[in-house]
Amino acid sequence: MSTSPYGGRLPNGLGLSVEPRPGAGLVSVALTVAVGGDADPAGLHGTAHLVEHLMFPRAAASDGPDGGHVARVEGAGGVCNAETHRDHTVFHTTVPAGMLTEVLEWEARRLLTFAPTESVLRTETSVIAEEIRGAAAAGGVWEAALAALHPGSRDAFGTAAELAGATTADVDAFFRRHYRPDAMVLSVVGEVDPDRAAASVERFFAGLPTGPAPAPAPAPGSTPAPAPARTAAPATIRTAPLPSPVSGAVLGHPLPDPVLDRSGHLAHVVLAETLGRTRLPRLTRRDPRIVSARVTCGYHGQWLGGAAPDLLLAQFATVPGAGPRAAADGWREVLTELAERPADPAEHRRALNALLLACHRRADSLTARSVSLGRTALLFPTAPGPDALPGDLARVTPAEVSAAARALLSGPCSVTELTAPTTPTGIGENR
């Protein structure tokens, strides 16, 4: 068995990356497509999410006892799932290594036979409507900050009312336009022979039609909005309040573009880890108005999980009546501390070590590794591969983290108040 990694493209443009892990006993296959919610047609917000769902065809009578795609994978002792982001969609499957050929055939089959029926379409739009309601109930703070800082941007979940009007012709046109082999990367990681895997991919995927390229129109919100004219204070953008179990506020900041300014982006990642690990816990101990505080970097906490625009969010729970002012005061306080005085070597090293551990855990997971290879190839084609990330992080200096804190202090910030329900008086009283 060859143990050398393989990378290349099929004649139809499909990207392929194969990374052997001898002795793993498993293999993970990720299909990453360079389309997400930013490409949703006008009036059909959520089409990319809907197509993702429709890529998991349900069992039909003609399928026989093995059932639909999910049933086949689970029957082989594997698991599969998918995620729709703003700028890409990824499908990942992990199975015993001996099932790789079958999984590649199934993956190609659902691309070649994509033809959802009206009944399946209506079922999946109902499922997505429930997901949208669940996301709204979970808060929607990331989406609120994104819309404030990057006008025109929308989440990848969708809008239930718009999806209710989607037709099979709509989703078929979207699929034909965007699910082209030259806009996809297939990543295979695990106990696999790269030469045999490449031969199987050629066998099953060579017949994918190339199709017309999408019109070169910029997606809404794909680039940051022009910075407002700088005044004495940075721009603060208030969003509509959001309901929450506890009162508080969420403050959002745009992150540097990870392609155009990779070092600046990673400095913000280290800043977020430093704040969350040491500075915010100290703040909650000394400020009685703040109950808890946390900071996340990247799309729902997945740093380098997407290209620009992306966000850093600071979420605060406060005592009743403190309002968003307490959160804003505390946030500026901890940022100013780091902006004026860099972290000492021990604090900086603890933050770096935590991030490096997360990198190594991702690399250890076959699924995470296969997803990372595809995501890097599509979203960050000029950047070094995922193996360069630990070294790039380790080179971030305390001075660069301080510069990142200064950038947040001087740049735009969204503020979303979290409002907790009030308990009516008299409930539970004995009269």
Regions found by a protein language model. Name each.
Residues 1-18, 193-240, 392, 398-431:
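Proteolytic maturation boundary segments
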Residues 23, 28-94, 153, 274-292:
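M16/MPP (pitrilysin/insulinase) zinc-metallopeptidase core fold and M16-derived inactive scaffolds
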Residues 74, 250-254, 272-318:
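A structural supersecondary motif
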Residues 127-142, 232, 238-241, 246, ...:
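Short acidic/His-enriched helical or mixed secondary-structure segments at domain edges of catalytic enzymes
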